[in-house]
Structures are given as structure tokens and as C-alpha cells.
Amino acid sequence: MTKPKHRRGFRFYASIYRKILVQDLKSKMSYRADFIISTIGMIMTNLSGFVTFLILFKNFPSINGWDYHHMLFLYGFSLIALTPVQCFFDNNWNLRFQVQSGDFIKYCFRPINVFFYFMSEVFDVKGLGQLAFGVGTLVYAWVNIGIPVTPLVIAKLILFLLTASLFMIAIMNAAAATCFWIVGSGYVMVIMFRFKDFAKYPSSIFHGIFRILFTFVIPIAFVAYYPSLAILESESVPVLTWCAPALGVLFFYLSYKFWMLGVRKYDFTGS
């Protein structure tokens, strides 16, 4: 399916997003009990990771050179990096249902970018609980490690957190887009999302095959490990860490083009 291109400026899309976001939040706030319960569930899930490290490091002083606080730093970093995909791109989970039912066609006739329109319909506020927990964990680890707080370090932290976010967003975009070609593609989304659990561990602890897999095939190592080394390491920072920002933008762009390719190939129910 082809559709005319509509070029709009940032202010236009920001205005549209604000209006859609307000309506979505109003809808969610009408079910406050569900929101509170789901947010508590999100925090408890993340807390379990914290407790796991606490128990683990009571028995082992370090894992392949990573001590308790460095592992917590990586964990907090990964939680913050995963927040954008949780908050802003959660509608990817609904894509296959919209495609299978034929309801997705409604997005194809609006004079705005289909990808933007579809993603903007859902904002997962539970992700804010994850963000708060991630920030708390990162700050706690930061203080105990003794990382200096300078403008340069803060700038690197922001840059590499954004970089890490792009990788997970891209992974989920690509996984969701498979529904345009594969019937019952939900398992692809589930598998790719489960891989995020490996992001909280340093890539160096895995077997060589898995290091290659998580670096060059399914780049989970870029969701936290490689970007965080820009903050944790003052010397001997891997080349892949410095390449991460450019690779993140490229990977996100490719996932977006793949998603939009699916839109162009889309045949709605009854066509």
C-alpha cells in the first residue's frame, strides 16, 4: 500500500503528541486502581533484580571483575535505558492485533506519519516507576563507586543513556514489524523482549558465542554494557563504546524503515 508523503515540522508533531498524550492519560487515570497495582508490580519486579544481586554478592565478591556496586550501576543504567521503549513505544505490543483484525488501516489514511501516529496513541505510565527505581539504583551505585560528578561525565551519561535506549527501541520495532509478514508473530516480540534481562549483566561474563550474539546479532550488549563503560572506565574504553551513538542512530533508523516497509506491504482484512 502506498500513500502520499506528508512532511510536517517538529512543532506540529509535538502539538499532536501532547493532545494525544493528555487523552491517553485521562483514560488511564479513570482506572486508578489498575494503574496503582500495575505500577507497584513494575517496581516489585525491578526490586527483585536488586535483591538477586544482593544475594549473589554475599557469596561471591566479584564476577569477572565486576563487584556489587558496579553491577548495580549497570542494572540501574539498563532500567533507565529501557524506560523510553516502555513508555513511548509500548503500542508495538498491539500492532499484530491491529494488523490481523484489519483495524490498522485507519492509521494509513491520516495526513501524518503512520509510525508516529501509531506509537503516540499509548503512553505506558508504569515505565515512570521503572525510571524512578533505575535513577535511585544508579545514584546509589554512583556514590559508592566514587565516580566524579563533572559536566563532561554528566554529558556522557546523557548521551550514552539515549544511545542505549535507541538500541532497545530498534529491537522491539523490528520484532513488532514481523507481524506484517508472519501470522502469529507474538512469539518474536516475547523472545526479543526477554533478551532485555541479559542487558543488566556485563557482556564479558558470557561465553564467546553469546558475546557475539549479543553484540552483532541482537545487540543487547549496547543497551547497557558498552554505553556504561564510557562512565565506568577512564582508560581502555572499547572502540564499540565510542561507536555506540552512531550505531544506535543507524539501528533505530533501519528498524524504522523496516517497520514502514511493513506498512507499505500491508493488506488490510477484506482487501
Roles of regions detected by a PLM:
Residues 2-271:
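Hydrophobic transmembrane alpha-helices and immediately adjacent juxtamembrane helices
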